[in-house]
From Swiss-Prot:
Basic residues composition bias: residue spans: 64-76
Phenotype when the gene is knocked out: Mice homozygous embryos for the Ppp1r35 gene are lethal during early embryogenesis. Homozygous embryos are capable of initiating and completing gastrulation as well as specifying the anterior/posterior and the dorsal/ventral axis, but exhibit a developmental delays which are the result in the failure to progress past 8.5 dpc to 9.0 dpc.
Protein name: Protein phosphatase 1 regulatory subunit 35
One of the GO biological process terms: notochord morphogenesis
Coiled-coil residues: none
Family recorded in the similarity comment: Belongs to the PPP1R35 family.
Entry function: During centriole duplication, plays a role in the centriole elongation by promoting the recruitment of the microtubule-binding elongation machinery through its interaction with TTTN, leading to the centriole to centrosome conversion. In addition may play a role in the primary cilia assembly.
Species: Mus musculus
Quaternary state and interactors: Interacts with PPP1CA; this interaction mediates the PPP1CA phosphatase activity inhibition. Interacts with RTTN; this interaction allows the mutual recruitment to the centriole.
Gene behind the chain: Ppp1r35
């Protein structure tokens, strides 16, 4: 039993001796890095040695020996983002520093800074005894928007201008009659239609005219014939003359009337 216990103790001590981790692998020499970009745009990667996990320490001795032998070849590399470059901190401008241009503190129209400046001037005038109350009231009334509106109302009443025109001068009436809206829509639709051909105006119907042979006898008329040469007259050239379309129907009506 003692021998068996001694052998077991020796085997346990041997395992503990094997489980003692060796020195960590030496990191590579730092390579020259590229210039760091601006913060927010840094996408560079830097290698870092993989820390040994606690599970690797409890692994079998055979596996640990194999890892020690091939640590240089199969070592894992973890990449992480480079830390952002330090931003240059500019010294803040002191509010009360003399000789500085405070562009943001310039009093503007209708601003709280302008009102505070006027209040400070009024307090300084009261403290020095140069404050004129009547003049201040007159100046305020001259600048007041309410006073100007009330004055315009009074002038408009004196000129007999209706109150509706003074209040709603540039507004559009929303109570439009339905008939007016329909007429406007109908006019728009008609304007989009092509123009219709217009019918010719009706001519006045003429009555029966006088008889042309009332004062003459056709049998007593003399006829003249031209003295032609051997060649005779040159052949006439026929030329078409454009006539309006309504002349055809007018001629037809006249012939029917004469036949009757």
């Amino acid at each position: 039993m003692m021998g068996f216990g001694a052998s077991a103790l020796e085997s346990i001590e041997g395992e503990e001796a094997l489980e003692v981790p060796g020195p960590p692998p030496e990191p590579r020499a730092p390579e020259p890095r590229a210039p760091e970009p601006e913060p927010g745009l840094d996408l560079s990667l830097s290698p870092s040695p993989l820390p040994e996990s606690p599970k690797a320490r409890k692994s079998s001795p055979g596996q640990r020996k194999g890892r020690r032998g091939g640590s240089r070849r199969g070592r894992q590399v973890r990449f992480q983002l480079a830390p952002p470059s330090p931003v240059r901190s500019e010294p803040l401008l002191v509010a009360g520093a003399p000789g500085d241009d405070h562009e943001l503190e310039a009093p503007a129209l209708q601003s709280s800074l302008a009102l505070s400046l006027e209040l400070q001037n009024a307090r300084a005038a009261v403290a020095s005894g140069q404050f004129d109350a009547s003049k201040a009231v007159e100046e305020q009334l001259r600048k007041s928007f309410r006073t100007r509106c009330a004055l315009e109302e009074t002038v408009a009443e004196g000129l007999n201008v209706p109150r509706s025109k003074r209040l709603y001068r540039d507004l559009v009436s929303l109570q439009v009659p339905e008939e007016q809206v329909l007429n406007a829509a109908l006019r728009e639709k008609l304007a989009m239609l092509p123009p219709q051909p217009r019918a010719p105006p009706l001519k006045e119907v003429l009555g029966p005219g006088p008889d042309m042979t009332m004062l003459c006898n056709p049998d007593s008329l003399w006829s003249e014939s031209p003295h032609l040469t051997v060649d005779g007259l040159p052949p006439l050239r026929l030329q078409a003359r454009p006539r309006p379309s309504e002349d055809t129907f007018l001629m037809h009506r006249m012939l029917r009337r004469w036949e009757a």
